[in-house]
């Protein structure tokens, strides 16, 4: 037990307390015992760096305040919904996973929009409080992040868009069909 604590202290000194905290949450459900294995900690550390890099380009703050894209709004609100539900179930490992998925999506979109990223900082603050507080001040806020309201999701951003599906015969794509997810069936005149 003493040896384990010493390794945790070494990890904390090398990667930071928030990386260690998130790694422990990411290991699995809190009610289950988990073997201590440090091989995955660099992945959590890389995730936090990737999150940080959404705000910075070559070490300089690089954020915009444009109208967010529909894809980035969907990613944000999907994450807020999932993390909120998972916190209520104390499913902290899936919260961390949801953050990772969101940051990967926003990185692919090259999102540096403060209207998307600010709520994400607030959302991650219970999981990585030191990281979130530092980032909060880096983007120009004067008050602590702890005073901010928890972000709420809006269902209008969670609606699935149309999907394209390839149709294949004998392993070769012949054509693509579209599934219109926003269509509804008429209910009047149905017997």
Task: Describe the function of each predicted region.
Residues 1-7, 11, 182-191:
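Single conserved hydrophobic/aromatic residue that forms the stacking wall/gate
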């Amino acid at each position: 037990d003493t040896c384990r604590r010493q390794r945790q202290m070494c990890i904390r000194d090398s990667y930071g307390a928030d990386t260690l905290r998130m790694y422990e949450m990411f290991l699995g459900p809190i009610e289950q015992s988990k073997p201590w294995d440090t091989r995955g900690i660099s992945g959590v550390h890389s995730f936090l760096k990737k999150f940080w890099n959404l705000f910075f380009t070559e070490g300089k703050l690089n954020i915009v305040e444009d109208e967010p894209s529909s894809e980035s709004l969907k990613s944000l609100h999907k994450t807020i919904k999932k993390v909120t539900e998972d916190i209520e179930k104390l499913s902290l490992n899936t919260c961390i996973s949801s953050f990772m998925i969101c940051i990967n999506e926003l990185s692919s979109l090259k999102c540096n929009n403060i209207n998307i990223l600010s709520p994400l900082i607030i959302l991650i603050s219970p999981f990585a409080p030191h990281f979130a507080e530092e980032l909060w001040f880096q983007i120009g806020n004067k008050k602590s992040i702890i005073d901010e309201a928890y972000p709420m999701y809006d269902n209008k951003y969670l609606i699935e868009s149309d999907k394209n599906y390839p149709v294949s015969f004998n392993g070769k794509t012949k054509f693509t069909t579209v599934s219109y997810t926003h269509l509804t069936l008429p209910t009047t005149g149905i017997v």
